[in-house]
Structures are given as structure tokens and as C-alpha cells.
UniProtKB/Swiss-Prot annotation:
SUPFAM superfamilies: L-aspartase-like (SSF48557). Its main location: cytoplasm. The gene is argH. It is an enzyme of class 4 (lyase). GO terms for molecular function: argininosuccinate lyase activity. Gene3D superfamilies: Fumarase/aspartase (C-terminal domain) (1.10.40.30), Fumarase/aspartase (Central domain) (1.20.200.10), Fumarase/aspartase (N-terminal domain) (1.10.275.10). Its EC number is 4.3.2.1. This is Argininosuccinate lyase. Keywords: Amino-acid biosynthesis, Arginine biosynthesis, Cytoplasm, Lyase. It is found in: Cytoplasm. Belongs to the lyase 1 family. Argininosuccinate lyase subfamily. The keyword Amino-acid biosynthesis applies.
Amino acid sequence: MSDQSNQKELLWQSRFSEPFDREALKFSSSVHVDGLLYREDIQGSIAHATMLGEQGIISKEEAGQIVTGLKAVEKEIESGELTPVWEDEDIHTVIENRLKELIGPTAGKLHSGRSRNDQVATDTRLYLRRNIDRIGELLKAMQSTLLDKAEQYKHTIMFGYTHLQRAQPISAGHYYMAWHSMFGRDAQRLADLRKRANISPLGAAAFAGSTLPLDPARSAELLEFDGVFTNSIDAVSDRDLVIEFVSACSMIMMHLSRFSEDVILWSSAEFNYLSISDAFATGSSIMPQKKNADIAELVRGKTGRVYGNLMNLLTIMKGLPLSYNRDMQEDKPPLFDTAETTASSLSVFRRMIEKTWLNEERLARLTAEDLSLATEIAEYLVKKQIPFRDAHRITGKIVAYAIEQGKTLPTISLDEYRTFSEAFDEGIYDDLKPDASVNSKKTAGSCSFKSVEEQIARAKAAR
């Protein structure tokens, strides 16, 4: 039988005739998770108490007492002097109980006109805002590192790939600027989300509002929100913002995972395009020669974890009637895990990329000898007024011939080229150089050195 002795009184317990079962309390306790919200909870409570005092719902002296007490509780939590235990049920209870011990019965006035429903919704939005800003700064740092890499390698020729097959020569700077664009969209998504998250739900109470003369706009102002809720039911029952945040983080992790895949492949002996600093690689416990791209592999693996968090949240919310339901307590583990996983992945991956370098000599040798210049032959023929489909067919036959003869495209003689089409002349050899191929691209946003330099300049100007 569960032991009910020495159980702390819970904030909602007065209506019940017997104590809450201890096993049920332990099962439902969230303090081990939502303890992370103590700063946000105290921040929201200080704003609420200040507003209560200004509105005359409590005296200004009482409001001052509460604010001073809350700041003391925050210091105790930060110093480790106050350690929550599962019997406290949640972080809101921990803080209010300790506040009562410090300032006495006045602590009971803090919750005037407030429910844990709008309280936790406020805490969550404050947490989202802080982590949106945190991850946004990490994305800016990532973009800055990618700009440096693009600048460093803007005149380095490498392969561009489709289907993981060598496709066409490109500027390596163009490759790094592609990632810069992707992480830029991630930052835009978060900035857009921040606008929706920065609306205060405080004052919605349980879900129907309050009969007390609250001033939700003042609470919002104190918490630096941009506005207040327009529907009290929506204010406490909505978790769209949490789902949207985890979705945005899933996109970030997807980009990191794809980038990781390139790092893993390119640093392998089979590719040997990229070298990773020893500071960001690991070895084997049995094979002394190994140098593994473990950081990239871990980032790739953690992506699945964040995807799982997104499905977790969608599944929690899909069948809930309005307004608040206790199921929604379970949004915190996937939210917190996603924020920490995304932030740590961005931080360590950026530092790893900073300490990588391209093997330029190998790339120069491989691109000069490869069949990836075939598209240049097709476009050369198009410029000679041959329809593209015919040019493509002719070029395909030339590629097959080169493979059969063991030749590279630049080493095929003009007489050999002319057996495929009379349109060929000496000018074909000007196009069969990797740098000429890259710099012949004329479209905006292409891989030419000029275009890449323009991309870099625009990105620097936008910082």
C-alpha cells in the first residue's frame, strides 16, 4: 500500500477528503522536467505580482514583498540551496511553497487572477523566446563560418554532385554558400515564429478569464511581449508554437544531417576531399589507424531524435478537446530536448567545420581528368546551333567512346571529336578546362567565381 504519511499539501488539494496517492503523485509529478522553467516562472510571477499591486488587487507593499521573496527563491535555486523533489509536483508548487516559507501568508495572494494554465503557457512562451534567440545567434555564427569558408575556397574547383555521382565542376565557395542559404532560411523561420510566440497569455486564467480587474497589457509590457491574447481558450490550450518550434528545429537538424553526410563521405579515404582537425575526430579501440568523423555522425544520429520529438508532440495534441488537458504536461520533455539538442549540435558542428580544410591539390587533379565536363560539350554544340537533344545524344556517345578508349575528354583529338559532329573546332578545348567550365556560367546565382563573389558580398552586406 502507498505510504501517505508526511505528504506535502498540494496547491489544489483542499477540495479532496483524502491525500493524493503517493504512487499517483510520483507518476504525475513533473518537477524533474519543468524545473528548467524556474527562471521563466519567477519572471512571469514578478510581472503578475507587480501588475496586481498597480491594479490595487493587492497592496503595493504586498507586491513588493512577493517580488523580493521571488528573487530570493531564484537565488536559492541557482545556488543549489533549494532543490526540488518529486513530492513538490511541479516547479510552480516548489516556488510558491518556498515563497510562503519566506514571506508568510502574503505569498498566497500571488495567484490572484491566475491559473497554472495561463502561468505555464506564459512560462513556455518565455522559454521559446529565449531559445529562439539562442538558436538564432548560433545560426548567425554558422553563417559567418560558412562565409569565411566560401571566401577561402571561392576559387577552388571541386565536383558538384547529383545522385551522389560526379555531375559538373563548381566553385567550392558556391558549395559553402548553398549551406549559408539553407541556414539563412532556418533563421528566417525562427524569426517569424518569434513574432507569434511573443504574445502574452497571462490573464486568461484557467481558460475563461477572470472577474478581477487585471491588466493583461501591463503584464505583457513588463515581460516585453508584443501584445496580449485575443481569446482566453486559445491562450491556454494552444501548443502550436511548441510544435512549430520543434518543426523549425527539425529543419535545422535536417540541414545539419545532410551537411554531416558530406563531411563523413568526403573525409573518407575513398573520397579524401576534406580533412578534419584531430580535435574533432575519434579513433578506434582496436584499429589504431582509424580517424572517425564521430561528431558529424552524432549530429546525423541526433536528427532522428528531434524528428521523434516532433511526432511525439503532434501525437499528444491530436485528440485533445478544448481547452487545457493534463496530457499537455508531456510537451515539456520533447521541447526541452529539442532546444538543447539543436543548440548543442549547431555549436559543435560549426566549430568542427571551422577546423576542416579541402584537399585542393587532389580536387584539382580529379576535376581536370573527369568526365564531369561533358555538359560543356553539349552546351558547346548548342552554341553551334545544334538542338539540345541532338547535342545531348552526341555528347553521350563521346562519353561512351572516352570510357571505351580509356581517355579523358581533353585528350580526345579534334579529328576524333569531328567523327561525332562536324561542328567541333579547336574552341572545344577552351571549354574543357574546369575553371573555364565554372566561369562560363552566366546565370545569376551560378557557380562562377564572379557569381560566388557577388553572393559573398551580398551576404556580408546583410549581416
